[in-house]
A protein has these predicted regions:
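C-terminal catalytic histidine-bearing segment of alpha/beta-hydrolase fold enzymes
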Residues: 131-186
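Serine-hydrolase catalytic machinery in alpha/beta-hydrolase-like enzymes
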Residues: 1-52, 150-164
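Alpha/beta-hydrolase fold nucleophile elbow
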Residues: 51-63
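Acidic catalytic loop of the alpha/beta-hydrolase fold
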Residues: 112-116, 145-146
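Short alpha-helix in the alpha/beta-hydrolase fold that links the catalytic acid
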Residues: 117-128, 140
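Short beta-strand/loop motif that positions the catalytic acidic residue
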Residues: 101, 107-109, 140
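Gly/Ala-rich beta-loop-alpha elbow adjacent to hydrolase catalytic centers
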Residues: 62-66, 70
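A conserved short beta-strand
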Residues: 79-89
Length: 186
C-alpha cells in the first residue's frame, strides 16, 4: 500500500465551489510558482517525516490543476521517484531545460480535452524529449477533461464545461499508474 498526503495548494484552506473560484485560486498559485514550490516542498517534508513512509520511494500525483502542478514541480527539478498527471495542464511558461527533470513522469490525457489541445500535447512531448525526461504520455481517444471523475458529466452540465467521465480511461489510467509506480520504486 501507499501513504498519501493531500496538499492545500490554494492555501488558507480555500475550496472552490464554482469553476470561476477554481480558476481564480489556481491562477494565483501559477502567478507565484516560488510560493507554490515552497508549499509543495513543505508538504513533501512533512510526508517524509511520517514513520510509515519510505522517504526513498516518493511520488506526486495530481488531477486537473494538481496534475499541471506536479508537472511544474518536475520541470523545476523536483527530486522524487515519479509524478503522475491525470487530465492536467501540459502547457508551461517555463519549459524544462536539459538535465533539469530528475523524476519519471506519467501523463494520462484525454485526446478530445479542449483544455489540453493537440498542439499542447505535441509541444509537451517535444519539451520532454529536449529535456531528456523519462516520461510516458497516454492520450485516450474520444476522452474529455475530468475523465476520472464519475461526477464529471453532471458537473459539466451544471457549469457548461466540456467534462465527461470515461469509466474505461479511468480504469486504464489507474492500472497504468499502479504499474508505473511499481517500476519507479524498483
Amino acid at each position: 500500500g501507499y501513504t498519501a498526503l493531500a496538499l492545500d495548494m490554494y492555501g488558507d484552506g480555500k475550496q472552490a465551489s464554482h469553476p470561476d473560484d477554481a480558476k481564480k485560486f489556481a491562477g494565483a498559485v501559477r502567478q507565484n510558482m516560488d510560493v507554490a514550490e515552497a508549499r509543495f516542498n513543505a508538504g513533501l517534508e512533512l510526508l517524509k517525516q511520517q514513520p510509515n513512509v519510505n522517504s526513498s520511494q516518493l511520488a506526486a500525483i495530481g488531477y486537473c490543476f494538481g496534475g499541471g502542478l506536479v508537472l511544474a514541480m518536475a520541470r523545476r527539478g523536483l527530486d522524487i521517484d515519479a509524478v503522475a498527471s491525470f487530465h492536467g495542464s501540459l502547457g508551461t511558461q517555463s519549459p524544462a531545460q536539459p538535465g533539469t527533470i530528475k523524476t519519471r513522469i506519467a501523463v494520462f490525457n484525454g485526446a478530445d480535452d479542449p483544455m489540453s489541445k493537440a498542439e499542447q500535447v505535441v509541444a509537451f512531448k517535444e519539451e520532454m524529449d529536449k529535456a531528456g525526461a523519462d516520461y510516458m504520455l497516454v492520450d485516450y481517444p474520444g476522452t474529455m477533461h475530468a475523465f476520472t471523475n464519475p461526477d464529471a458529466d453532471e458537473l459539466g452540465a451544471k457549469f457548461g464545461l466540456p467534462l465527461k467521465y470515461s469509466a474505461e480511461a479511468d480504469k486504464d489510467s489507474w492500472e497504468q499508474m499502479q504499474v508505473f509506480l511499481k517500476e519507479s520504486f524498483k
